[in-house]
Amino acid sequence: MLLALDVGNSAVKAGLFSGDELVRVFSVDPPDADATDASYWRAELDSALADATVEHAGLVSVVPARTDAVARGLRGVVDAPLTIVAPEMALPFTLDYDTPDTLGTDRLAAAAAGWTRYGRDASRSVIVVDAGTAVNYEVVHRTGTYRGGAIGPGAVLMRNALQAGTAQLPDVPLHLPETPVGSSTRTALQSGILWGLIDSVQGMAARLAAQLPDAPRLVLTGGWSNPLIDHLTIEAAHAPHLVLRGVRLLAEKNRA
């Protein structure tokens, strides 16, 4: 089996693949004190992978301080090659990005999976939206060229910024209200954050699409993709775990 790891800002998400089939997904949300402790990751991964035979692993990370700890923890559990995704590896598209050394590898994985699954065979441009802690937009031109995209705040960051930057606005649970007209401070915040996120994604998708020569395929993924797919008024594909699928794809493509 192939193990795909996505070391994110809030948690480490993992997927086990048999061929191209995703057979199991799990996540680990470490306490801050343990996030860079290799022995913690060794214990967590040893438990999670007790019944799995891992023959190859791939990893993307947006938290450099955790990358080495997770990798060392994994190497203490499985005797398998580990491919760490990087912009200089073999990719399913050409990079047209001014600063590839700063390109998040989670973005690269999402774009690779989105292009391969939804755009390449049809020679159709693709826009991937990964809605998590941040909202990442990836643009792949129909010629197979990654053009870049955009990065914005996700729902949790918006809520935290409003709470931290104001004197009286409370912390609120992130539930989408039925109407955008908030009749209380709580529902007004929920509306501004979540309906605002939905409209932001819809507006950005349209702006990015206008830069392309064809009608691109819009693909949604990430932890906040469910309310988006339910409420956008434009057509989109829903592709859960797209980053993990991209990690698998790139690890296989670059397997020694």
From Swiss-Prot:
K(+) binds at D130. The keyword NADP does not apply. One of its GO terms (biological process) is coenzyme A biosynthetic process. Its cofactor is NH4(+); K(+). The active site is at D106. Catalyzes the phosphorylation of pantothenate (Pan), the first step in CoA biosynthesis. Belongs to the type III pantothenate kinase family. Homodimer. This is Type III pantothenate kinase. It comes from Salinibacter ruber (strain DSM 13855 / M31). The lineage of its organism: Bacteria, Pseudomonadati, Rhodothermota, Rhodothermia, Rhodothermales. The gene is coaX.
